[in-house]
């Protein structure tokens, strides 16, 4: 792992999910209209896409994944997702997750209304996470949140309020784990949390009125 330290708004008008964007906690398996009760979708189509560099200014982090690791993602062997504490409360944590998908999970189609997404997500095997946690959060709590057993502290956020961690599962497949450990991470200036509370939109989304807007 290479580590160095350098100093959006969700649409309320539509529950539609665009291919290539992660599903927010508000959207996971949920549909507000009765007519959507039986709506189904393929979760693997909505994992985060590979990029040359990921810049999360509300987390105060940017990182680059290895080319081989990105190939695993492009081949749908690894799902990149996100998670954060409730957006209507004080931010306690926010992180990106990296998970192994089986062939069955890659092909799976789930029902939005019946908690299908949560069941699918919980069935994935966690490789590791990158994110921030409120200062003085115990490693025991971080382990519970991230589903990881090994935590490397990258540093402290620029506002001094959060600890930044790179977390992994020590017993995971060595080839995938070693590639994940090649991730290059930097701490950058952390922007103030947006009014809508969602901190997992990237730099390219910041000028838009909603995250992931095309």
Predicted regions and their residues:
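N-terminal, intrinsically disordered, polar/charged segments of Gram-positive cell-envelope systems
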Residues: 9-65, 198-213
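N-terminal secretory signal peptides
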Residues: 62-78
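Compositionally biased, intrinsically disordered low-complexity regions enriched in proline and serine
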Residues: 47, 55-59, 70-73, 118, ...
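Conserved polar/disulfide-associated segments of primarily extracytoplasmic proteins
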Residues: 75-211
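C-terminal motif of bacterial Sec signal peptides marking the signal peptidase cleavage site
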Residues: 4-7
């Amino acid at each position: 792992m290479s580590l160095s330290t350098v100093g959006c708004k969700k649409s309320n008008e539509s529950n539609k999910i665009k291919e290539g964007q992660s599903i927010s906690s508000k959207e996971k398996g949920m549909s507000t209209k009765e007519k959507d009760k039986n709506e189904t979708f393929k979760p693997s189509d909505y994992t985060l896409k590979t990029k040359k560099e990921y810049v999360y200014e509300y987390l105060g982090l940017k990182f680059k994944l290895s080319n081989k690791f990105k190939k695993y993602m492009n081949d749908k062997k690894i799902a990149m997702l996100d998670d954060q504490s409730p957006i209507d409360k004080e931010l306690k944590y926010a992180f990106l997750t990296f998970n192994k998908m089986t062939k069955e999970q890659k092909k799976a189609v789930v029902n939005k209304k019946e908690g299908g997404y949560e069941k699918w997500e919980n069935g994935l095997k966690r490789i590791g996470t990158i994110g921030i946690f409120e200062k003085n959060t115990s490693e025991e709590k971080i382990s519970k949140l991230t589903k990881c057993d090994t935590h490397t502290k990258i540093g402290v956020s620029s506002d001094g309020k959060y600890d930044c961690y790179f977390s992994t599962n020590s017993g995971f497949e060595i080839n995938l784990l070693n590639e994940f450990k090649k991730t290059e991470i930097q701490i950058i200036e952390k922007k103030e949390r947006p009014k809508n509370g969602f901190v997992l939109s990237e730099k390219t989304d910041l000028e838009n009125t909603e995250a992931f807007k095309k």
